[in-house]
From Swiss-Prot:
CDD domains found in the cross-reference section: AdoMet_MTases
InterPro entries, sorted: SAM-dependent_MTases_sf, UbiE/COQ5_MeTrFase, UbiE/COQ5_MeTrFase_CS
Keywords: Menaquinone biosynthesis, Methyltransferase, S-adenosyl-L-methionine, Transferase, Ubiquinone biosynthesis
The enzyme's E.C. designation: 2.1.1.163, 2.1.1.201
Family designation: Belongs to the class I-like SAM-binding methyltransferase superfamily. MenG/UbiE family.
Name of the featured protein: Ubiquinone/menaquinone biosynthesis C-methyltransferase UbiE
SUPFAM superfamilies: S-adenosyl-L-methionine-dependent methyltransferases (SSF53335)
Length: 251
């Protein structure tokens, strides 16, 4: 059953009204936006750069393509795609959170990335783009925060061109028991302390750890993508499945 099929959904380990989740998630990212990049480096020990580089390589963007970096936050993927698609291409950095968009826009403009990137505040469940518009859609570490993931996947399928691909980079389920135990200890004991020290906000990082545990596992997300209409869906585990990259096509 889709999370959007009832009036309740998960916000971390809490059960909340479905129509309240977006505001609750927004408050988390308003709080951490300014230190988001620093926390990514610290809490992943820099490994998030490898995960994102693999995503870019898998996307195989070419000059002239249109790319949607959904839940793109501070623009790490957008910056790479901007160079790959060139002057004839287009990259849209979309995020539901205006604080994250502002940080991303400032960071990319400071890097001189201005000509082929646009910024759109958008809800993944109802994307404000035409049908059959993008060659590639990426959503990195954003799907778990969406209230109705099934609706979001259908919305992504709609705006993809036939032959286009969706890449979902997201925290997932470690494959081995020893890694699971170490990951739990890190997520619930160490990560909130880091958040408190760096962002002065332990609660937001407690939510982020909980939201990872509530996110569908690798095979469940694969089935969700297939149900939404994506074909040739598969996934690659990274760092023992702490993160997985799911790929699917529209035909």
């Amino acid at each position: 059953m889709s999370e959007g099929d009832s009036n309740k959904t998960h916000f971390g380990y809490k059960t909340v009204e479905a129509d309240k989740k977006a505001d609750l998630v927004a408050s988390v990212f308003h709080s951490v936006a300014a230190k988001y990049d620093i926390m990514n480096d610290v809490m992943s020990f820099g490994i998030h750069r490898f995960w994102k580089r693999f995503t870019i390589e898998t996307a195989a963007a070419r000059p002239g393509m249109k790319v949607l970096d959904l839940a793109g936050g501070t623009g790490d993927l957008t910056a790479k795609f901007s160079h790959l698609v060139g002057e004839r291409g287009q990259v849209v950095l979309a995020d539901i959170n205006d604080s994250m968009l502002k940080v991303g826009r400032t960071k990319l403009r400071d890097k001189g990335i201005v000509n082929n990137v646009s910024y759109v505040q958008a809800n993944a469940e109802a994307l404000p783009f035409p049908d059959n518009h993008f060659d590639i859609i990426t959503i990195a570490f954003g799907l778990r925060n969406v209230t109705d993931k099934d609706a979001a996947l259908r919305s992504m399928l709609r705006v993809l061109k036939p032959g286009g691909k969706l890449l979902v980079l997201e925290f997932s389920k470690p494959q081995h028991e020893m890694m699971r135990k170490a990951y739990d200890l890190y997520s619930f004991k160490i990560l909130p302390k880091m958040g408190e020290i760096i962002t002065k906000d332990a609660d937001s990082y407690e939510y982020l750890a909980e939201s990872i545990r509530m996110h569908p596992d690798q095979d469940t997300l694969k089935e969700m993508m297939q149900t939404a209409g994506f074909e040739q869906v598969d996934y690659t585990n990274m760092t023992d499945g702490i993160v997985a990259l799911h790929k699917g096509y529209k035909f």
